[in-house]
Curated annotation (Swiss-Prot):
Protein name per Swiss-Prot or TrEMBL: Small ribosomal subunit protein uS14
Keywords: Ribonucleoprotein, Ribosomal protein, RNA-binding, rRNA-binding
Pfam families membership: Ribosomal_S14
UniProt cross-references to Gene3D superfamilies, sorted A to Z: 1.10.287.1480
Domain of life of the native organism: Bacteria
One of the record's GO cellular component terms: small ribosomal subunit
Gene label: rpsN
One Gene Ontology biological process: translation
Gene Ontology MF term list: rRNA binding; structural constituent of ribosome
Keyword GTP-binding on entry: no
Stretches of the chain forming a coiled coil according to its record: none
Function: Binds 16S rRNA, required for the assembly of 30S particles and may also be responsible for determining the conformation of the 16S rRNA at the A site.
Database matches in PROSITE patterns: RIBOSOMAL_S14
Amino acid sequence: MAKQSMIARDVKRAKLADKFYAKREELKKIIYDINSSDEDRWAAVLKLQMLPRDSSPSRQRSRCRQTGRPHGVLSKFGLSRIKVREAAMRGEIPGLKKASW
C-alpha cells in the first residue's frame, strides 16, 4: 500500500490540473500560433511559467485504484499488474483470461 500522503499529493495535482486546464491551453495556443507577435508569445510564456508547477498534467502519476502502487499500472483497468492478475484469476474481469500457446 502506498503512503497516504503520496496518494493525496497526486489527488491535489489532479485537481490543480483540472482547475488550470483551460488557462494553460489558452496560453499554449498563443505560444504555438505562428501569426501571433513575438511580444504576445513572450508574455504568454511568462504567464505560463507563473502558473503553479503542479497544475501541469505531466506531473501526475498513474496509480493503482486499489493499492495506490505507482509502478506497473495498466491504464486500461486502472489497476497495477498484480491486482489485474489477481482479479483475472478470480474471473472478475470479463473477457480476460490467462494466455496459453
